[in-house]
């Protein structure tokens, strides 16, 4: 048996079991502050082209206690081959010796830490627990968010709007076991009672065009390139803006880039968490993700594994 074969490697289901949403949110809270303080190294991701329009994404990160490296391949042609579009893993390392400790499923880490960052933003920006949350989108990101928001805000009603007739109802039926409060939105109009909207699509053009309004937090998740925007530019311009990672947002937050925002007026999630941002007016939280959030997932998994061994 080689040293590599003794390293624990967890599949998607096992990775999800190690990343309990409330625990992941708590770890992210500390990790966001450390990253903002310069205590975590998280460089811009490296993108390497593959054949057929695919890309290989390398996202390393390092802190005093742990280092991580996410290596993910995105291959659009895999759908026709009956293979997943996204494949990869996140490796965790001892930050002093460099020894590999364990390996997690990459897409599962990405999905769960993305949903947890959304939940942290809602918790930090909305103030009181939300009552009615609208998810726009019915794909994998929406599924992760439904589970996360149900776990962290169990009393909130979760409404879903899809891009096709019947897609929201089918989504709710498929995921109600994980999120009992799921219900399809009745019609296209967004009720005034909705106090949080989360956009979770692959659309390159706006799927949310409502005017910016006090009392409603809009969270943009789906758009991840400079020329894609899920949220209308006027909505963005008339909102007070917060991003999870200011460095990455300048290159990847298409909703803000298309709207040509003044980056001097864009706050960070770390600013909100340390009380340096006034939570008033129409609010918009844009997430782009970064390797430091993968590190937070590895910390959460490490703690869960330690608890299992101790038990």
From Swiss-Prot:
Keywords: NAD, NADP, Oxidoreductase
Annotated PANTHER family: KETIMINE REDUCTASE MU-CRYSTALLIN (PTHR13812:SF19)
Protein role: Catalyzes the reduction of Delta(1)-pyrroline-2-carboxylate (Pyr2C) to L-proline, using preferentially NADPH over NADH as the electron donor. May be involved in a degradation pathway that converts trans-3-hydroxy-L-proline (t3LHyp) to L-proline.
A GO CC term attached to the entry: cytoplasm
Documented EC number(s): 1.5.1.49
Top-level taxon in the UniProt lineage: Bacteria
NAD listed as a keyword: yes
SUPFAM superfamilies the record matches: NAD(P)-binding Rossmann-fold domains
GO molecular function, one term: oxidoreductase activity
Protein name, per record: Delta(1)-pyrroline-2-carboxylate reductase 2
Pfam families membership: OCD_Mu_crystall (PF02423)
TM annotation in the entry: none
Family of this protein: Belongs to the ornithine cyclodeaminase/mu-crystallin family.
Natural source organism: Burkholderia ambifaria (strain ATCC BAA-244 / DSM 16087 / CCUG 44356 / LMG 19182 / AMMD) (Burkholderia cepacia (strain AMMD))
Matches recorded under InterPro entries: NAD(P)-bd_dom_sf (IPR036291), ODC_Mu_crystall (IPR003462), ODC_N (IPR023401), Pyr2C_reductase-like (IPR053444)
Catalysed reaction, written as an equation: L-proline + NAD(+) = 1-pyrroline-2-carboxylate + NADH + H(+); L-proline + NADP(+) = 1-pyrroline-2-carboxylate + NADPH + H(+)
């Amino acid at each position: 048996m080689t040293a590599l074969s003794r390293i624990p490697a967890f599949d998607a289901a096992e990775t999800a079991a190690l990343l309990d949403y409330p625990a992941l949110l708590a770890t992210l809270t500390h990790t966001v502050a450390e990253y903002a303080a310069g205590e975590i190294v998280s460089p811009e991701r490296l993108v390497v082209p593959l054949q057929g329009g695919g890309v290989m994404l390398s996202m390393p990160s390092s802190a005093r206690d742990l280092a991580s490296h996410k290596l993910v391949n995105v291959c659009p042609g895999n759908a026709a081959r009956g293979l997943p579009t996204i494949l990869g893993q996140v490796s965790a390392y001892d930050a002093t010796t460099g020894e590999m400790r364990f390996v997690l499923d990459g897409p599962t880490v990405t999905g769960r830490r993305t949903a947890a960052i959304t939940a942290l933003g809602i918790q930090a920006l909305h103030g009181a627990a939300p009552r009615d949350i609208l998810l726009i989108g019915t794909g994998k990101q929406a599924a992760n968010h439904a589970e996360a928001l149900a776990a962290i805000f169990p009393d909130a009603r979760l409404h879903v709007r899809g891009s096709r007739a019947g897609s929201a109802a089918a989504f709710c039926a498929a995921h109600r076991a994980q999120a009992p409060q799921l219900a399809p939105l009745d019609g296209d109009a967004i009720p005034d009672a909705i106090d949080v909207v989360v956009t979770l699509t692959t659309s390159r053009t706006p799927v949310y065009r409502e005017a910016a309004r006090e009392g409603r937090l809009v969270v943009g998740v789906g758009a991840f390139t400079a020329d894609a925007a899920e949220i209308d530019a006027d909505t963005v311009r008339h909102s007070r803006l917060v991003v999870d990672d200011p460095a990455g947002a300048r290159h990847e937050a298409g909703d803000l880039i298309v709207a040509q925002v003044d980056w001097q007026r864009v706050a960070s999630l770390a600013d909100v968490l340390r009380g340096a941002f006034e939570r008033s007016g129409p609010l918009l939280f844009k997430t782009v993700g970064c390797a430091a959030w993968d590190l937070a997932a590895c910390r959460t998994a490490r703690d869960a594994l330690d608890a299992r061994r101790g038990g």
